[in-house]
Amino acid sequence: MESSRCRAFLAAAECGSLTKAADRLNYTASGVSQLISAMESDFGFLLLKRTTRGVVLTAEGEKMLPAVRAFLSQENRMHELAANINGLDIGLINIAAYSSIATHWLPKVVAAFKKKYPKITINLMEGVRQEVLQWMAEGRADIGFTSGGDDIDKDWIPLADDEMIAILPRNHPLASAESFPLERCRHEDLIMPAMGKDEDVMTMLKKYGIEPNVVYSTNESFSAWALVENGLGISLTNKLLVHGWTCDVAMVPVSPPEKITLGMILPSVKHASPAVKRFMKYAIKELKQE
């Protein structure tokens, strides 16, 4: 299997467009199309359906996509191992991370890492918890930074605990209180970020048998807090996410006190590429000091 064909197929599948795939790979659109057509000819079935809006995966393409990702990942790892044997530090690391971690933790880690390994390329994907886990499951990310949980079926390295807090309007009766009782979420107007399914918040409320009164949902936490600022409800989040953020709201610890554990996910620490192992060690060293 030719890797150039696989890369063309993967880029087209992820971009949904031959033109965008060509831009990513620095090819022409016709060149990408020819590579994919050759791959389809070898396999004996279509991988992509061409439409007026771009390209979409066929049922067969959906089945082949994970295998193609795995093939390219192993090829990258092979090149990294060869370079490592020759004393060269090269490689590619795909990182998926929480917004709070991508904003407040990773810049320092990446800066320190790149000083020593300037030839290792880092690709950072930012998303909510379910997106991070999905990208890990699909093989799109080599390392995931998110909160822990029973649903993690990969190698998990805890790094730090983070307090859960309530985001309240300034005129809220408990804006100056020492804590915000989670029980109030049964009747308070709750604004839920993370596409309306913040897994950290939902897990916390489920622990106490609380069915929240969700009145608004947003994709981004910052959008949820802007709604809070305008008196449209309250929100819940982890403290790291609001670090350095300025908005006219009150931030109050929840009661009973709750925290989440933030850390790293890897498909396998043992079988990780040399570049990924190096980054993992840097992350542990830098973030354990937080």
Residue ranges and their predicted role:
Residues 174, 188-208, 272-280, 290:
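Secondary-structure junction motif
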Residues 42-43, 64-86:
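Alpha-helical linker/hinge and terminal dimerization helices associated
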Residues 90-152, 218:
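Central regulatory/effector-binding core of bacterial HTH transcription factors
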Residues 153-158, 162-163, 177, 223-271:
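Beta-alpha-beta core module
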Residues 40-57:
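A short LG(V/I)-centered, amphipathic sequence patch enriched
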Residues 87, 153-164, 168-190, 274:
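Flexible hinge/capping segments at coil-to-helix
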Residues 128-133, 137-140, 147, 196-252:
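Hydrophobic hinge/microswitch elements
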Residues 11-27:
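Short helix-boundary/capping micro-motifs
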